[in-house]
Amino acid sequence: MKAVGLVTEYNPFHNGHIYHIQQAKAVTGADVVIAVMSGNFVQRGEPALFDKWTRTQAALANGVDLVIELPTFYAVQPSHLFAEGAIKLLTALGVEDVVFGSEHATVDFLNLAKQAPSVQGGKAFQEKNQTFAQAYATQLESETGFKLEDPNDILAFGYAKAILNLNSPIKLHAIQRVAAGYHDQSFTDDQTIASASSIRLALHKGKLEKVKGVVPNQTLVDISSANHTVDFESQFWPLLKYRLMTDTIGQLGQVYQMAEGLEHRLAAVALGEPGPQSYQSFIKAVKSKRYTFARIQRTLLYTLLNVKVDQMQAAMQDPYLRILGFTDKGQAYLNGAKKTTTLPLISKVDQHLAKANLRLDFKAGKLWQLLAREPGQQQDIARQPIHFTQAHTKEDK
Amino acid sequence: MKAVGLVTEYNPFHNGHIYHIQQAKAVTGADVVIAVMSGNFVQRGEPALFDKWTRTQAALANGVDLVIELPTFYAVQPSHLFAEGAIKLLTALGVEDVVFGSEHATVDFLNLAKQAPSVQGGKAFQEKNQTFAQAYATQLESETGFKLEDPNDILAFGYAKAILNLNSPIKLHAIQRVAAGYHDQSFTDDQTIASASSIRLALHKGKLEKVKGVVPNQTLVDISSANHTVDFESQFWPLLKYRLMTDTIGQLGQVYQMAEGLEHRLAAVALGEPGPQSYQSFIKAVKSKRYTFARIQRTLLYTLLNVKVDQMQAAMQDPYLRILGFTDKGQAYLNGAKKTTTLPLISKVDQHLAKANLRLDFKAGKLWQLLAREPGQQQDIARQPIHFTQAHTKEDK
C-alpha cells in the first residue's frame, strides 16, 4: 500500500482540511492517508480547541486512515522543530510522499533548503530588533532571492530541511493555498473554506451560524458540548500568574526556552501592581521585538507545564508513534509498518508510560482538561485508539 | 510603660477578642496591649478570612495598641512552633506578661512544661495509628497526670515550653475560656461570644444575621465588600490540583513538612480519574490517622506556596518584627522598644525585602489575593503601618 502523509493540527477540523485530503490522494495516487497531528496543544502554544480524540474522530470521518499524535515536545516548537518531528514520524512509518499547502506552491522547497544558509552564518543575525526567524529569512533572501515569510512556506521549508537532515526518502508536493490565507481573520458567508484562525475567532465570538458554511456539522456539535477551550485564557492566566508568583527565579530560569533573562521580566510583570488583568495584556506587557507572539506563548506554556530544559532534551531523544485512531485501511497499513518501523508504536498508555516517555503528553492532557470549560474524558490512561468503520460513520449520522 | 502581649489570629475579630483585651489589661495592669497576629494565613493552613490590614484595623479599633505580624514561617506551624515564634517576638519587644484563654486556667503551665517529657522519650511514640500530638499527650499524662487535649491548653503549654527554651522573662496568665469552646460549631441568638470557627461557619453559610450578635459591626461590613476568602476552597483546589499535576515527585518531595512519602499519595489522588471534585474530598482521600487535618492542610498550603525545606529553615533563622499598625500609645511604646530590641523592626517592605527575608509573607499575600473573591489592595510593597487615632475612630463611625 502506498501512503501519503499530512502534517496537521486540525484546530478545528474544517472544509479546507477535506480539500487537503482529497488533493493529497489525487496528487500522489496514494491508497492510505496518514495524518500526524498535534495533540492537546498546538504549535502556537495554545490548547487545541477540541481534545485530540475529538479531532481524530473528525479526521477519520473525513478521509484520513490513520492518525498519529505529534508528541508535545515536537508539536509545541518553532516551525523547524515542529516540521522535523513530523517528518521523522512519517519517515518511520514508511510514508513516501507528503502533501502540504503553500503560499508559493511552485517553489522547489527541497532545492531552496539545499541553498539555505547555515544557522550561525551571516551578518543579519547581529540585528537585535528582530526575531530569529526574521533574521534567518533576511539571510536566505540575500542568498537565494526567495522571501520566506508566509507561514505555510516556512513550514514547507522546515519539511525540506528535515528531509535533508534525516536523509529521508520522502518526496514533497506543494498545493497552492486557496481562498483563505493562514492569517485571514474574517470570511464571508459564501466562502466554503476559511482559515482555522478565523474559524476560532468566530467561535470565540459565539458566531456559530457564521461557521456553519466552512466546517463539517460535527464541529458545531462539539462546540455546543462545552468540552472545548474556546475561552481557555480565563483559566490559563490565573494558573500562570500563580506559577510565576510562587516559583523562584531560579526555577523559572530552568524552563525550556526561557532565554536571555526573560524569567525576570515575566515574574516582575506578573507580580506588579495592579498587574495585567488578562492573558492578552500580560503577553503584550512582556513581549519584545526579539520574540514572536507564538514564541512567547510557547515559553509561557512550558512555564505552566513546568517543563525544564533537561527534561525536554531527554524527551526529544526518545520519540514514539502514538496511535490515536485508524480506519480498516489504516489498520492494515499499520500491520505492515509494525514490522519495519524503527520507533516504538504505542496504542495504549498505562501509569508506567505516563510517568516515563509520555509524561509530557500526559501532563498536557491533564492541563487541557483543566483549561476546558468541561474536562471531559481523561486523555491518556487506558484510552484505546479509535477504530473508525463505515458502520460507525452511519451510526454517527 | 508596661506592656501585655496577646497571641492572636483574629479570624475574624469578634466579641470574645474584646473580652480578652479587657481581661488582659485588668489582670496585669498594663498600659499598652500588643498583639502578635498571624498574617494572611492562619495556623490551620487556611487563608485568613480578611487580610492582615483589615484585621489589624479591627484590633486597633477595639483596644489593641500595637499589632505585629507573626511571620508565615511561624504562623503556619504546629502549635509548639507557632507558640515559640510568638513568644520570641513578644520577648524581643520587651513584653513582660502574656495573657491567654485556656480550657484549664488553674493549671500552672510553666510548671507542667518543666515536668514535660523530652520529645524523643517514651514508648507512646511507637504507636502508628495516632498523630504526634496524641502520642506526646499520652506520654505527658502518664508522667504528670494532666491530659493536654484542648486546643488553648496546647497553645498555653507551647508558650510555657518556649519561655523555658528561650529563657524569656515573660510571665503567663491564663484566663478561663467562657461561653464558647474553640471547636463549638454553633451558637445561640442570645450568645454575645462565639468561637471564631463557628462564626466562620455561619459566614460561610451566608448567615450574616446570626453573626451580628457576636462580632463588631465592622466585620459585617467587611464581609459584604467581597474582599474576603469565605469561599477560598473553590479557588484553592484547582490551583493545588494544577501544582500536583505539573510538579515532579522529586520537587513535591522537597516541600516543607512533606514526610513519609506523602507526595506520592497526593499526586496519585490528584491525578486519579475521575479524581476528587473538591478540596474537602481531596483532603479526606489523602488523610491518614498519622496526621491531623490541620497538619495535612498546612502541608498542602506549603505545596501551593512552593516552599521547600531549606527555604523554610533559612527563613526561620531570621525573624523580624513587622509592624502592621499602632495607636499613639503603641507608637510611643515602639519608640522605646526600638532602642532595646534585638530583632529588626520593619515598617515598610520594598522590592528588596520582598525578595529576601519577607519573601514568604510576600508570596502568601499574593496567594491570599488570588484566593479572595476580590483581590483588594496589595499586601506588602509600599504599604504603611496603620496609624490609628481616636479621630480616625470617630470618622469610621
Curated annotation (Swiss-Prot), chains A, B:
Its EC number is 6.3.4.-. The keyword RNA-binding applies. One of its GO terms (molecular function) is tRNA binding. Keywords: ATP-binding, Cytoplasm, Ligase, Nucleotide-binding, RNA-binding, tRNA processing, tRNA-binding. InterPro entries: Rossmann-like_a/b/a_fold, tRNA(Met)_cyd_acetate_ligase. GO terms for cellular component: cytoplasm. It is found in: Cytoplasm. It holds the Pfam family HIGH_NTase1. It catalyses: cytidine(34) in elongator tRNA(Met) + acetate + ATP = N(4)-acetylcytidine(34) in elongator tRNA(Met) + AMP + diphosphate. Catalyzes the formation of N(4)-acetylcytidine (ac(4)C) at the wobble position of elongator tRNA(Met), using acetate and ATP as substrates. First activates an acetate ion to form acetyladenylate (Ac-AMP) and then transfers the acetyl group to tRNA to form ac(4)C34. HAMAP family: TmcAL. Belongs to the TmcAL family. This is tRNA(Met) cytidine acetate ligase. It comes from Leuconostoc citreum (strain KM20).
